[in-house]
């Protein structure tokens, strides 16, 4: 489990695709501390299992389902990615419950500065949007954020400068994809509600 509090920005060394799956290598520092082969690291919100460790990075296998559902397949050498280790049992719970199981992607529509915040507008599919609620939690590229507005074809979040500096979100431009994970509690509530109707 993760919390959506990014620990550092890593740099992609390579994304080697073979057919529909691949291997991702990332240069990192902080997330390597106490990390072992077999541990989980969220890369742009996607839970990946560390398959090998280097003094300054790690590699992980990326399944075909992950390539299809997330934006990891478009990573290139030099790309910056958000990194977070799985939460330790004695860790602080700073964001919200994040599984690292991406629901799909969205597209950056605009980034607008307003005083000490930046409004980020994201378009996404109806399947993801119907589980997004105003003032609820959403995980965007591994970042725990609060939904400020829900619109007909997307939603908006307001990002403080600190979050912008510590993550890759404000490096995005309109048209860039982002990984989205809906609040897991909302997903279970929606599932139970559908079953009760049947």
Label the model's feature ranges.
Residues 1-198:
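Conserved loop->alpha-helix
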């Amino acid at each position: 489990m993760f919390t959506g509090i990014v620990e550092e920005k890593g740099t992609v060394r390579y994304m080697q695709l073979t057919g529909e799956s691949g291997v991702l290598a990332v240069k990192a520092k902080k997330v390597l501390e106490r990390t072992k082969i077999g541990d989980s690291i969220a890369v742009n919100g996607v839970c990946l299992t560390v398959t090998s460790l280097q003094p300054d990075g790690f590699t992980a296998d990326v399944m075909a389902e992950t390539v299809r559902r997330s934006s990891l397949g478009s990573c290139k050498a030099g790309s910056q990615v958000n990194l977070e280790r799985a939460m330790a049992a004695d860790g602080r719970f700073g964001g919200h419950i994040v599984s690292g199981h991406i629901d799909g992607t969205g597209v950056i529509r605009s980034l607008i500065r307003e005083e000490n915040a930046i409004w980020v507008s994201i378009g996404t599919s109806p399947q993801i949007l119907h589980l997004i609620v105003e003032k609820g939690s959403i995980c965007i590229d591994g970042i725990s954020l609060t939904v400020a507005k829900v619109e007909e074809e997307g939603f908006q979040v307001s990002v403080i400068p600190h979050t912008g500096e510590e993550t890759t979100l404000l490096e995005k431009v309109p048209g860039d994809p982002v990984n989205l994970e809906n609040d897991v509690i909302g997903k279970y509530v929606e599932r139970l509600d559908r079953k009760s109707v049947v």
